C-alpha cells in the first residue's frame, strides 16, 4: 500500500472516526454489556469483566458478556459486594474460551477487595493517576493490587502485564470506555480525573496490521512498545484525545483499507 501523506491520513482518520464513533454500533460491541446499567459501579464492574473476555469472535464476546451478567443476577456491583459463598459457587459453570468459572470467582473477589480498599476500580485509577500522572505506572500498580490477595495463579493470564511488555489491549480499551468523553454517546466519560490525553490505543493483531498499512506503526511486534509508537503517531493528529482514532482504525479494517 502506498504511504499516505499526513494531510490525507488526517482526512481519512477523521472521516472514519465520524463514521464509526456512533451509538448504532454499540449493540455489536463489548461496550454493550456495561450499557445494560446506569449506575457508575455497575458500569465499572460490567465494563471491566466484559473487557477481560474481549478476545476472539466479537459476537461470541458480546454474548458471553451478557451471559456473565445474568450469572451475577444482572446486578454486578451488588453481586461483587455481597455474593455469598453459595452464590459464588454457582459461577463454576460459566466459561468463555479459557476464562472459566473459577477465574470469574477470583475476579469477583478481587473486585470486592478493590471496592473495600479503594472505593472501587475507578477510584483506584483516578487516585493513582492523580498521584503519578504516569498511565503505564498505574497499569502496573493496578495489576499488582488486583492480584494481591489469594487467587489461582492461572487467572493471572487474563490480565496482561505491562511490566512484561504486553500491549494490555483489553485494559486500554476499558480505560477508553471509562475515560473518553465526547458528544457521540459511545464512551462513558465517567472518570473525569484522568485526561483523555493520558490514554493509550488498544492494540491487537488487527489494529496493528491496520496501523502498519496506514504508516502509523513500524514495529513488527504487537507489544507495549508498539502501543507507545502508534499512540505517539496518533497524537500528531489530536494530542488531547488520540485514542478517539481507535474508531478509525477499527473502521479502516471494516472498510477494506488493508486490501
Language model: regions and residue ranges:
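HhH-family (HhH-GPD) DNA N-glycosylase catalytic core used in base-excision repair
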Residues: 1-259
Amino acid at each position: 500500500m502506498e504511504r499516505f501523506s499526513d494531510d490525507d491520513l488526517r482526512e481519512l482518520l477523521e472521516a472514519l472516526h465520524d463514521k464509526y464513533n456512533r451509538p448504532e454500533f454499540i449493540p455489536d460491541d463489548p461496550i454493550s454489556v456495561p450499557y445494560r446499567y446506569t449506575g457508575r459501579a455497575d458500569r465499572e464492574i460490567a465494563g471491566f469483566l466484559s473487557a477481560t473476555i474481549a478476545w476472539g469472535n466479537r459476537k461470541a464476546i458480546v454474548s458471553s458478556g451478557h451471559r456473565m451478567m445474568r450469572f451475577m443476577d444482572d446486578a454486578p456491583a451488588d453481586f461483587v459486594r455481597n455474593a455469598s459463598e453459595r452464590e459464588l459457587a454457582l459461577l463454576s459453570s460459566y466459561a468463555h474460551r479459557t476464562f472459566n468459572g473459577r477465574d470469574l470467582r477470583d475476579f469477583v473477589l478481587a473486585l470486592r477487595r478493590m471496592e473495600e480498599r479503594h472505593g472501587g476500580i475507578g477510584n483506584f485509577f483516578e487516585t493513582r493517576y492523580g498521584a503519578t500522572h504516569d498511565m503505564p505506572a498505574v497499569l502496573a500498580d493496578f495489576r499488582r493490587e488486583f492480584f494481591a490477595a489469594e487467587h489461582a495463579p492461572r487467572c493471572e493470564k487474563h490480565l496482561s502485564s505491562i511490566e512484561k511488555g504486553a500491549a494490555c489491549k483489553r485494559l486500554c480499551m476499558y480505560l477508553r470506555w471509562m475515560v473518553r468523553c465526547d458528544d457521540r454517546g459511545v464512551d462513558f466519560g465517567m472518570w473525569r480525573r484522568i485526561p483523555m490525553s493520558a490514554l493509550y490505543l488498544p492494540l491487537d493483531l488487527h489494529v496493528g496490521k491496520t496501523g502498519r498499512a496506514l504508516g502509523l506503526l513500524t514495529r513488527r511486534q504487537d507489544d507495549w512498545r508498539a502501543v507507545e509508537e502508534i499512540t505517539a503517531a496518533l497524537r500528531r493528529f489530536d494530542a488531547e484525545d488520540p485514542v478517539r482514532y481507535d474508531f478509525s482504525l477499527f473502521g479502516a479494517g471494516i472498510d477494506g483499507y488493508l486490501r
